[in-house]
């Protein structure tokens, strides 16, 4: 193995000076990098009329306060929430006292809702999926993914409402795929720009489909292709659109070659 160079790049917004340290390990660079520092500075400079925002990560995640989602919010407030979501990629609202119907009402302000074909829903609110996790329940969500990329038109966003959470653990993690794209070496970025990924429901949900119904379900939800690098429709930023759960392979390559 080679040596690892841990590098902290000069970041005026954080008051850091350049420092280098070599330790035995993998040949990678770690630490604040210029494209993250620039985006973080931009996000910290944003201001909002209908709520306050507190950044939670360097370039992803913000807590929005001073807004009641159970109310019928005016359209300018909804547009500003959408703009905040576009900017921070994920937003959090604490201590919201909402019913299931209010949850759905808020979600409908942002577009058409869908019913998940594999997760169980309820008759009263079929657009809602209830997740229950505990010592007696298993799961397979502990892999990075974007929801329902196996659809021809994947969901734009997901709205989670926590009803009961543990004191420790149970975390949901989020990654900034714009920052991931910006941080690619130039040769990998050029290669990724020309690739298309094949997405399939079968990698995650195939075992839930009875064998006698598999062909029927495949006809309803056939494999779809999406670019590995996409452009956000409102911000214009480029981002990586691949994940280990739903991407079966890269077009023109075998699954083994795609890893």
Residue spans for each PLM region:
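Non-heme Fe(II) oxygenase catalytic core, chiefly the N-lobe of the double-stranded beta-helix
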Residues: 2-259
């Amino acid at each position: 193995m080679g040596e690892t160079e841990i590098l902290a790049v000069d970041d005026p917004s954080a008051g850091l000076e350049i420092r280098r340290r070599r330790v035995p390990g993998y040949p990678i660079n770690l630490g604040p990098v210029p494209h993250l520092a620039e985006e973080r500075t931009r996000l910290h400079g944003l201001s909002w009329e209908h709520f306050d925002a507190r950044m939670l990560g360097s370039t992803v995640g913000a807590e929005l306060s001073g807004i009641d989602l159970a109310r019928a919010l005016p359209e300018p407030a909804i547009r500003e929430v959408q703009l905040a979501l576009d900017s921070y990629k994920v937003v959090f609202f604490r201590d919201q006292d909402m019913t299931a119907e209010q949850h759905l009402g808020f979600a409908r302000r942002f577009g058409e809702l869908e019913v998940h074909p594999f997760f169980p829903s309820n008759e009263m609110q079929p657009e809602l999926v209830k997740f229950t996790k505990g010592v007696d329940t298993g799961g397979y969500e502990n892999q990075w993914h974007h929801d329902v990329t196996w659809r021809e038109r994947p969901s734009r966003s997901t709205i989670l409402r926590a009803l009961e959470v543990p004191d420790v653990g149970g975390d949901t993690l989020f990654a900034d795929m714009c920052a991931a794209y910006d941080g690619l070496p130039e040769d990998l970025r050029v290669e990724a720009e020309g690739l298309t990924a094949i997405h399939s429901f079968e990698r995650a949900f195939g075992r839930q489909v009875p064998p006698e119904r598999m062909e029927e379900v495949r006809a309803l939800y056939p494999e779809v292709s999406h670019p590995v690098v996409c452009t956000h429709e409102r911000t214009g930023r480029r981002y990586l659109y691949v994940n280990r759960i739903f991407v079966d392979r890269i077009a023109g390559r075998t699954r083994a070659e795609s890893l």
